[in-house]
Every structure is written in C-alpha cells, then in structure tokens.
C-alpha cells in the first residue's frame, strides 16, 4: 500500500465561487497593514536621524513582523478549506491516513508560510499563505513538532530541499525547487512510500543511497508517520484482515456450500474493515478487486475464494 494520491484538480473544482475575491480582500488588508508600518518606521527614522543601513534593517524587520501578524490574523480563510480538503480523503490526514485529527484547523501549508527551519534567512513562503494549491489536510501529529518515547517528528516549519539547496525566498524567485518531503498531491511521490506488516511506514525504494530513498526516509521522520499509536493501529488492522481472510479460506476449503452463510458474514466484516481503513479503494472498486490488487499484495496473503 502506498501513500494515497490527492488530485489538486479536485480541490480546484470544489473551491467556493467567491474564493479569489475573498483572497484579494485579505491581501488588501495585509498590504494596508505593512504600508502603515512602513510609514511609522520612516517617520521614526527622520525623527531619530537614522542612516540608510539602519532604516533598511528596521523597515525589513517591521514589515516582516507586520505581514506575519496580519497573515496569521486571517487564518480563518484557509481554515474554511478544511471541509473541502477533508472530503477528498474521507476525513483522513493526507500524510498518515489517520482520522484522529484533534485539531481545530487541520490545514497545513506544504511550503511553510512563516519560516523555513533549514534556511534561517528564509522569510517563509508568505505569498503562498492563501494559495489553495499549497494547502494539505493534516493531523496534528504530522504537522506539529512532537517527541514520544520511541519516535520524534512533526513537519512544522521544515521544508528541506535536495542539493543544490536553492529555495525561492520571494515571489519573484524562479528556482526549480526539489523538495525532500513527499507530497500527496504528486502522483510520483506517493509511490515512494509503503507500509510493512508491522504497520511501519517505510521507503518503497531499494537503493538506500538514492535521493528517492532519502526523501521517503526523511518524510517518515518529519511527518511522524511511525508515531507508535498510529503504527500499532495499522498493525491491528493487518492482524484482523489476516484473521478474517484465513477463516474465509479455511471455511471455503472445508465445505463452501455448508459454510456459505458464515463466509458471507466474514466477507461483510472484511468489507466494513476495509471501508473504514481504506475508503477510497472501495469507493471505486468492489471488495474482490480491492483485495486482489491492493490488500493481498500488501499483507502477503493467499486467497482461495477469488477467481
């Protein structure tokens, strides 16, 4: 099983009709706040007779802080996208597939809006703060810095880049960035991650010296994908699926006709479990197809009642 792909075209289709109008109004507000700060700083510079270097430094700092404060004051704007993003993943976190979001505003900025941990001089991708294509539906554990007894992680302000590390530090920069973190909206990225029978997320790349392996490995760490309760939940699902399939196999071989009602009940239980754990699979394919092409390869199962 791989990380699930989210089609950004589906996000765009669901945007509110007045989305761009709302964003334009927000930027007018933000630009107004930074303009006010600039006027105040320049007035103070005249009063205190600053040189150009001090003026430039103070302006940059004041505008940066005013912009950040103004952007954060409008967090309700990207917060309104939460339900739309959630609908594309059946309420599951786009990174770890958890439904335990426990967050009032589970919208992550893939390119962090306030700062970049790996590049101290980066102001953050503030110009993407209200860009819908930069939004990802994320649980608190994937998006916030956390440490437990066995793992640490949380994306927070991290946005590492593969060498050469050329970040776009303004809206005018045009560097081709190569992010380390896997993006669930990238159809190639989702195949770089898989899950083993112990419930652990791990690279789906054999060559551990390749950049692709590094991307998957660091994504597991920074998204906190092996947070112990989440990993154990995956393992429990694997155990239950294996048990149900094993029981259906045994009853089918013994006497299918005699056991068909029990078999049907077990198949219904299996269907319900997959529907809860992997709803996107059953939303487009019947149970047997989902088992044969996704669940069986993932769990290494043999099934004698399909075909």
Ranges and model annotations:
Residues 203-307:
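C-terminal, charged low-complexity interaction regions
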């Amino acid at each position: 099983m791989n990380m699930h792909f989210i089609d950004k075209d589906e996000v765009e289709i669901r945007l509110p009709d007045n989305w761009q109008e709302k964003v334009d109004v927000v930027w007018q507000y933000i630009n107004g706040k930074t303009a006010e700060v600039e006027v105040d700083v320049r007035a103070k510079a005249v009063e205190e007779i600053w040189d150009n270097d001090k003026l430039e430094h103070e302006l940059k700092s004041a505008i940066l802080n005013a912009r950040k404060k103004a952007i954060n004051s409008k967090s309700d704007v990207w917060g309104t996208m939460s339900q739309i993003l959630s609908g594309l993943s059946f309420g599951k976190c786009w990174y770890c597939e958890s439904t335990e979001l426990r967050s009032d505003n589970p919208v992550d900025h893939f390119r962090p809006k306030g700062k970049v941990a790996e590049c101290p001089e980066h102001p953050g991708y503030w110009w993407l703060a209200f860009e819908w294509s930069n939004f990802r539906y994320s649980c608190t554990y994937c998006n916030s810095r956390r440490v437990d007894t066995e793992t640490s992680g949380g994306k927070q302000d991290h946005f590492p880049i593969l060498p050469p590390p050329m970040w776009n530090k303004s809206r005018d920069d045009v560097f081709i960035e190569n992010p380390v973190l896997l993006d669930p909206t990238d159809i190639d990225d989702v195949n770089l991650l898989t899950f083993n029978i112990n419930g652990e997320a791990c690279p789906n790349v054999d060559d551990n010296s390749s950049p692709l392996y590094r991307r998957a490995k660091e994504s597991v760490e920074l998204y906190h994908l092996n947070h112990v309760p989440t990993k154990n939940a995956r393992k429990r699902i694997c155990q239950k699926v294996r048990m149900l399939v094993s029981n259906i196999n045994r009853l089918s071989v013994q006497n299918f006709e005699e056991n068909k009602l029990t078999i049907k009940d077990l198949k219904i239980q299996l269907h319900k479990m997959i529907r809860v754990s992997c709803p996107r699979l059953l939303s487009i394919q019947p149970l047997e197809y989902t088992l044969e092409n996704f669940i069986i390869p993932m769990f290494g199962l043999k099934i004698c009642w399909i075909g």
